[in-house]
Structure formats: structure tokens, C-alpha cells
Regions:
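Conserved CoA-thioester-binding segment of acyl-CoA-metabolizing enzymes
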Residues: 1-54, 81
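Hydrophobic, secondary-structure "cap" segments at the distal end of domains
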Residues: 136-137
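Glycine- (often His-adjacent) and acidic-residue-rich active-site loop
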Residues: 33, 52-82, 98, 126-129
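Hydrophobic/aromatic residues within transmembrane alpha-helices
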Residues: 16, 51, 63, 105-106
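A short, glycine- and basic residue-enriched loop/turn
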Residues: 23, 56, 61, 117-119
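Glycine-rich beta-to-alpha active-site loop
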Residues: 83-132
């Protein structure tokens, strides 16, 4: 895992925690941490994994500081593939905003639980852009 993503267990429940202020953007560090945490969770004795985030947002999408730079693996598509093929149920605990790639990530989880004030969306479509990982498919 990375400093931005941690994995812990309590009993038979695993928790992947994203903590990458200010908005938990999907930076290379977060993407790598998610893949590492999913790999750890897949092989332990837990029955379910919860994906949650610290701070005021769930995940607010791409890290704009990485725009214009060469892409680095794991890509968002790689992370989403890891979620979709995860062998145990995974629940996204959504608060704040889940935008763009953050919403796509939540949609790849088996279950989504959102607080009443949570907001989700694909703002890139308002600019005539397709979501980066196929969120409209």
C-alpha cells in the first residue's frame, strides 16, 4: 500500500481507507495503493471489504496535476478491473462527492451505500467528454 491508502481488518471485515487530501483524487499513489490493498484483501480471511475515504469527499475524480504527463500504471482501468474481479463482496461507503473516476470506482463495487447529502456525477460529460474509464457504458 501507499501512504494515501491503507488496509486493515476487524474480525472478518476488511477496510480499505483512502486518505489523500484535499479531495482524494485518483493520483498514481492512490491507484497503486488501491491495487495493493485489493491484493491484500483478496487473500486474507475476511468475508467483505469496505472502501471508504477520509475527508470531505469520497473520491473527486482524476488528479489534475497529472494531466499532460505520461500515463503511469496502474491506470484507472486497471483499478476498476481489479474491483470488478475482486473475489469477495466490496461495499463503497460514499460521502461528500463521488465525481468522474470516483463514481466509476464506486460503480465497480458490488454495493454502494451513500449518506443522504452525497453527490455523484460525471461532470466531464458536460464538456462533451466521455468518462475516462467507460462510466457511461
Amino acid at each position: 500500500m501507499t501512504a494515501s491508502v491503507s488496509y486493515s481488518t476487524i474480525g472478518r471485515i476488511g477496510t480499505i481507507l483512502v486518505d489523500s487530501p484535499p479531495v482524494n483524487a485518483l493520483s498514481h499513489s492512490v491507484r497503486q495503493g488501491l491495487v495493493d490493498a485489493l491484493n491484500a484483501a483478496a487473500t486474507d480471511e475476511t468475508d467483505i471489504t469496505i472502501l471508504r475515504c477520509e475527508g470531505r469527499t469520497f473520491i473527486a475524480g482524476a488528479d489534475i496535476s497529472e494531466f499532460g504527463k505520461p500515463p503511469q500504471e496502474p491506470s484507472l482501468a486497471t483499478v476498476l478491473d481489479a474491483l470488478e474481479s475482486f473475489p469477495k463482496p466490496i461495499l463503497a461507503a460514499i460521502h461528500g462527492t463521488a465525481l468522474g473516476g470516483g463514481l466509476e470506482l464506486a460503480l465497480c463495487c458490488d454495493y454502494r451505500l451513500a449518506i443522504e447529502t452525497a453527490k455523484v456525477g460525471l461532470p466531464e460529460v458536460n464538456l462533451g467528454l466521455l468518462p475516462g474509464a467507460g462510466g457511461t457504458q
